[in-house]
């Protein structure tokens, strides 16, 4: 039985005996696929290493990866121990090697990680892809530290398979209020005037402080400690795909 909670707590949390209904909706791959038609808009339930072998090569425009952070954690009675740096580096190399053939030559990949695993992931990512940038996502959630700075960020590495890739700049521009509007011949210069004020659409930077993490009062929130918000995923999809 799940612990009681307040009415405003919307965290998604299901007991194990209710999970079967959700698992029935998932796709279970047992053989290689010629295309993505049977798994489009569906969730695949299976072993990562086996599933990668069943997916067609060069079939994906975008990969958003959120690999396990190299931390010692207990999950549902199972304890995961932190690997040595060289072991985690080899693990990273193995899973990147598994997904690299699946990405189209025009495809992009984003890899989420914490500050510590980022030191390894960024380096190994460059062995398989062309690293374009490192996005820093400010996330105000987590405990403080008595003898260290509180960690309030996560890294998202952006890489592509080639120099020919999709990046929809207009779809992800950031609208900022203009404090000192500049005019030329009486007309706005690089800004727009609306009923709600004066704004400028600027190029997005690699520091994101405009996307909050899910909290207990939000309908998308889960108990996962490093959950990525729907808006974060949507921004990546808008930028690097045609969806």
Give, region by region, the residue ranges found by the protein language model.
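Core catalytic lobe of class I
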Residues: 1-243
